[in-house]
């Protein structure tokens, strides 16, 4: 039986982090978690990390698509925070962001890690950006590192 799985070290990986400025007090913590994970666990150097800032979560897929189209990166981490309010706006923003990022991954055969918080309350978002429930930015970085390795392993085995 052949089992393909990745590890989390990716010293030579070139990673783009596309980050929303909206809810910046939360999203900056996600960025810190992602950067710490990439450097500490993945051994990714600062020179191989590019941070792209966009206004909000709706803009993440377009920026991710442009990054993917450049062909210069091994993976993308998308970071943002969408918190439910009193209108259906949350559903549209969260859904379109998720769908758009998934489309980029499939179109460009490139891992796109989803580190966008989609919570009902600000308290839930705070918990997920580095307090009680961990740091979802760091978790997205771990996922990306593993997927970069899985895809490289698949490419080697399938050629």
From Swiss-Prot:
One of its GO terms (cellular component) is riboflavin synthase complex. One of its GO terms (biological process) is riboflavin biosynthetic process. It is an enzyme of class 2 (transferase). Belongs to the DMRL synthase family. Forms an icosahedral capsid composed of 60 subunits, arranged as a dodecamer of pentamers. Catalyzes the formation of 6,7-dimethyl-8-ribityllumazine by condensation of 5-amino-6-(D-ribitylamino)uracil with 3,4-dihydroxy-2-butanone 4-phosphate. This is the penultimate step in the biosynthesis of riboflavin. This is 6,7-dimethyl-8-ribityllumazine synthase. It comes from Shewanella baltica (strain OS155 / ATCC BAA-1091). The lineage of its organism: Bacteria, Pseudomonadati, Pseudomonadota, Gammaproteobacteria, Alteromonadales.
């Amino acid at each position: 039986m052949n089992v393909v799985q990745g590890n989390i070290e990716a010293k030579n990986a070139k990673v783009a982090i596309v980050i929303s400025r909206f809810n910046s007090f939360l999203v900056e913590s996600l960025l810190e978690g992602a950067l710490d994970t990439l450097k500490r666990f993945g051994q990714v150097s600062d020179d191989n990390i590019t941070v792209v800032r966009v206004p909000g979560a709706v803009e993440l897929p377009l920026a991710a698509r442009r990054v993917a189209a450049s062909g210069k990166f091994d993976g993308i981490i998308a970071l943002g925070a969408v918190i439910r309010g009193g209108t259906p706006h949350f559903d549209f923003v969260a859904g379109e962001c998720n769908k758009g990022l998934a489309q980029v991954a499939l179109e460009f055969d490139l891992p796109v890690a989803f580190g966008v918080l989609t919570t009902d309350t600000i308290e839930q978002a705070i918990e997920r950006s580095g307090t009680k429930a961990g740091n979802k930015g760091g978790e997205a970085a771990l996922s990306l590192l593993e997927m970069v390795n899985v895809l490289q392993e698949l490419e080697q085995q399938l050629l």
